[in-house]
Amino acid sequence: MGNPENIEDAYVAVIRPKNTASLNSREYRAKSYEILLHEVPIEGQKKKRKKVLLETKLQSNSEIAQGILDYVVETTKPISPANQGIKGKRVVLMRKFPLDGEKTGREAALFIVPSVVKDNTKYAYTPGCPIFYCLQDIMRVCSESSTHFATLTARMLIALDKWLDERHAQSHFIPALFRPSPLERIKTNVINPAYAAELGQVDNSLHMGYSALEIKSKMLALEKADTCIYNPLFGSDLQYTNRVDKVVINPYFGLGAPDYSKIQIPKQEKWQRSMSSVVEDKERQWVDDFPLHRNACEGDSELLSHLLDKGLSVNQLDNDHWAPIHYACWYGKVEATRILLEKGKCNPNLLNGQLSSPLHFAAGGGHAEIVQILLTHPDIDRHITDQQGRSPLNVCEENKQNNWEEAAKLLKDAINKPYEKVRIYRMDGSYRSVELKHGNNTTAQQIMEGMRLSQETQRYFTIWICSENLSLQFKPYHKPLQQVHDWPEILAELTNLDPQRETPQLFLRRDVGLPLEVEKKIEDPLAILILFDEARYNLLKGFYTAPDAKLITLASLLLQIVYGNYESKKHKQGFLNEETLKSIVPITKLKSKAPHWINRILHEYKNLSLSEGVSKEMHHLQRMFLQNCWEIPTYGAAFFTGQIFTKASPSNHKVIPVYVGVNIKGLHLLNMETKALLISLKYCCFTWQLGDAGTCFQIHSMENKMSFIVHTKQAGLVVKLLMKLNGQLMPSERNS
């Protein structure tokens, strides 16, 4: 806990899990936790408030842990039922943080107080009192520059988020953190008054109608030994071996205070059976709690299939952090393994609590047929290692169980076999097939390395997952193949779309965080080509809203790039038919503007071809196209979908579906139907705030004092990207 004399200011993070399942997960999810925060007014701004952690002062001469627990109880009494307060399980010092301002040179400690799992208890809202917030919602908007949090609180929350992520990777740490405190685990404490040294020791203990002195006298009078045996070794210098010959477990331990009138001492031959009953109870409880695991152990294919039809999760971990497939592979149940993989769509690389995979279990047990099934799975990671850095082949050769030689041969042969491949598309429709050396464990960074781009070019692009109406950018450590598999769940979480109509594909696209100043310095022809293809795609789809003159210039450049120099005999007015216009003019302008633009486009095309000062090298023309696009507000934006409400009349509202574009310049709203630019705001000109439950966000324009709310399930992603891109800007760039 540290030296209490050096600690004065203490901040307290009271956290609770939303359900017990999250305690056994090796993967950290912020949405599985809630945290207790205060809301306090911002100085000088009465209506605005910021969130802070609970804060207290520590008394150097008091017991720190108990003092903090008492403080939490007192602080939360107004919001809890029956004024009981929230009782923490223990107090953990996470780390100390240096203070700023007047307190420079001093430190504040952050203590973590784990609480009980969230239940149906209703906590009352009381102004000035703390309330629980979803940790994921908090972390989405948390940064040291955010006005929603005190700076020190933001710093502590970011550190707490990282700390929880690290602790989830440690076996048994999280279950131990939220385990009941030692005092809670003591059911009954009875002091034998015959051995009480002081009368005070038996206060509040079991009372039989006698004082401690009277009971002690009675027991001493009754304690008469018929036989006395001395231990000859006790107190002597003789050597002896300290060993346990027998362990006897009291089968009634932990069952509560018994009714002594009903207890019958069993006969000696029944003692062994009573001891085993405790183990039997635990096994029976495991069978009841984890039926899928039990049937995977036993290899009951029919019942296993039936349970999967009922919707039981193949990824659920039991108390030992094992999934059903781990048991099936450990016990050599071939058909059960096949059903879990094929019908249950189980991840073949699913790790248990000790970071061992199904392939490790099958190889360690020498189950060659299961090894074969796993190795032929398209998503398998042949090079996977466990917590000790061992491959499945290492485990197989160490254990030498059953048919281990055949299993080892299969593993050796698999190393040299061709890998499964995945198509990574570009925005022009072309693609490159990339080997998946680690199956569905392959990261976005590893796929980028397989694209055979130079290190310099890789900086400008990243891997995206896109379907018809949703596009998401991966971080380097994300595993794209797993996201493709989970796409229906992702769609359900972020949209109201029908998953059957949304087929995900992986794309190589511009990194949304790429600064324009960096892009303007790119000279590599391949990088320019990839950027050009993406810009052209977005232009034709109507995402680049610009004046007519700009769109006509871009159309003439596309004609020069696609058809070469202008020829009067070949490129007459009839040359620009409807099909040709589709390839050079935004879809939103085809009917309304394109027919009237034909002469202007041909005129600019002719002037461009005849201009001697313009290089006709392909990458130079493509760069000119990009230079014109850089001036468009929505260039390089990531687009999300949402809705805004406007007053159609005093009595009702009109719903307008919109695209929400976020780029290095700011935020932009486009009418989803017409692609008209409704609003475009630079970072210096607006503020934003995530709404409750993460289903909307509010925008306030500082120029015209206008505020509006965008309703979207993607609000958390939008706000997080706004914070990231705004944080990248230099102060001078924010106003440009």
From Swiss-Prot:
Keywords, in A-Z order: Angiogenesis, ANK repeat, Cell junction, Cell membrane, Cytoplasm, Cytoskeleton, Membrane, Repeat
Any GO CC annotation of this UniProt entry: protein-containing complex
Gene3D superfamilies for the chain: 1.20.80.10, Ankyrin repeat-containing domain (1.25.40.20), KRIT, N-terminal Nudix domain, NPxY motif-rich region (3.30.70.2240), Phosphatidylinositol 3-kinase Catalytic Subunit, Chain A, domain 1 (3.10.20.90), Pleckstrin-homology domain (PH domain)/Phosphotyrosine-binding domain (PTB) (2.30.29.30)
Stretch list, region Interaction with ITGB1BP1: 172-195
Tissue expression from the record: Expressed in heart, brain, spleen, lung, thymus, kidney and testis. Isoform 2 was more frequently expressed in the thymus than isoform 1.
Species for this entry: Mus musculus
Pfam families, per the entry: Ank_KRIT1, FERM_M, KRIT1_FRMD8_FERM_C, NUDIX_5
Protein name listed in UniProt: Krev interaction trapped protein 1
Every FERM domain range: 420-736
Protein purpose: Component of the CCM signaling pathway which is a crucial regulator of heart and vessel formation and integrity. Negative regulator of angiogenesis. Inhibits endothelial proliferation, apoptosis, migration, lumen formation and sprouting angiogenesis in primary endothelial cells. Promotes AKT phosphorylation in a NOTCH-dependent and independent manner, and inhibits ERK1/2 phosphorylation indirectly through activation of the DELTA-NOTCH cascade.
The gene coding this protein: Krit1
Region described as N-terminal domain similar to Nudix hydrolase domain: 1-170
GO MF entries: GTPase regulator activity; microtubule binding; phosphatidylinositol-4,5-bisphosphate binding
Localization annotation: Cytoplasm, Cytoskeleton; Cell membrane; Cell junction
GO process annotations (BP): angiogenesis; cell redox homeostasis; endothelium development; integrin activation; negative regulation of angiogenesis; negative regulation of endothelial cell apoptotic process; negative regulation of endothelial cell migration; negative regulation of endothelial cell proliferation
Principal localisation: cytoplasm
Subunit structure: Found in a complex, at least composed of ITGB1BP1, KRIT1 and RAP1A. Interacts (via C-terminus FERM domain) with RAP1A (active GTP-bound form preferentially); the interaction does not induce the opening conformation of KRIT1. Interacts (via N-terminus NPXY motif) with ITGB1BP1; the interaction induces the opening conformation of KRIT1 and competes with ITGB1 for ITGB1BP1 interaction. Associates (via N-terminus and C-terminus regions) with microtubules; the interaction is inhibited in presence of ITGB1BP1 and active GTP-bound RAP1A. Interacts (via FERM domain) with RAP1B. Interacts with CDH5.
Description of its domains: The FERM domain mediates binding to RAP1A and RAP1B and is necessary for binding to phosphatidylinositol 4,5-bisphosphate (PIP2).
InterPro entries in alphabetical order: Ankyrin_rpt, Ankyrin_rpt-contain_sf, ARM_KRIT1, Band_41_domain, FERM/acyl-CoA-bd_prot_sf, FERM_2, FERM_central, FERM_domain
Region of interest: Interaction with RAP1B: 430-452
Membrane-topology annotation of the record: Peripheral membrane protein
